[in-house]
A protein has these predicted regions:
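RecA-like P-loop NTPase motor core of helicase/translocase proteins
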Residues: 1-222
Length: 222
């Protein structure tokens, strides 16, 4: 039986609009690429003292201010006829300069190609801003497998749109911390697919510093 090949239309305007709306949130961000940081991951068998791998990790770097992101968000909402938000979520004091999370919701109708849009959005962010680390958080194993297949199915098509740039991906496994270490060090466009349970596992547990080091969950650290 012959293999099935999917044909993707790269010019669906509603999909391009969704990608542009997301990328425009960071308008003004230079192509600064990645910032370095220290990485410590347990690679032993989880018994005794354990073995820790120390390395330099690379992460996406956002240099524009939260206020600029808010202005970009309001412009994107106004363009779509939505009521502009007055603050980012979560809201922080005006004098806060420290890095902080920002949550955005992008809504699309069922059957409009949401997976295609967010996979292509990651590539567009890489092309414009140099960002190369992305997480896809899924609620179930079935959806995780579907995402993996979508990454395979769209690979050739998206490479053709983005100068042959490959996109590496893997499924997070707490028993294989070296894979996460490689992801953190890698400067290539990379995606980690992770079940939401990997975050929930430790989120409700109070850790001492030593317990945090030894936690089997290296994604979430208090």
């Amino acid at each position: 039986m012959s293999d099935v090949t999917f044909q993707f239309d790269p010019k669906q305007q509603f999909q391009l609009d969704a990608i542009d709306a997301t990328v425009s949130l960071f308008s003004g961000q230079p192509r600064s690429g990645q910032a370095g940081g220290n990485l410590s991951i347990e690679v032993g068998g989880g018994t005794g003292e354990g073995l820790y791998q120390h390395a330099l990790g690379l992460g996406n770097q956002l240099t524009i201010s939260r206020n600029q992101v808010l202005k970009n968000l309001q412009a994107a909402q106004d363009k779509q006829g939505l009521m502009p938000d007055s603050s980012l979520i979560p809201a922080l004091p005006d004098d806060t300069d420290a890095p902080a999370p920002m949550n955005f919701t992008i809504s699309m109708e069922t059957g409009t190609g949401k997976t295609y849009v967010y996979l292509r959005t990651m590539r567009q962010m890489h092309a414009e801003f140099g960002w190369s680390k992305f997480f896809i958080v899924v609620p179930s194993v079935a959806i995780r497998e579907g995402v993996k297949q979508s990454l395979r199915d769209t690979d050739k098509h998206l490479r053709e749109l983005y100068n042959g740039e490959p996109m590496d991906f893997f499924v997070y496994d707490g028993k294989k911390p070296t894979e996460l270490a490689a992801f953190a060090r890698n400067s290539c466009l990379s995606v980690c697919i992770i079940n939401i349970q990997a975050f929930i596992k430790d989120a409700d547990v109070d850790h001492t510093m030593e317990e945090a080091k030894r936690s089997g969950n290296v994604i979430y650290k208090p």
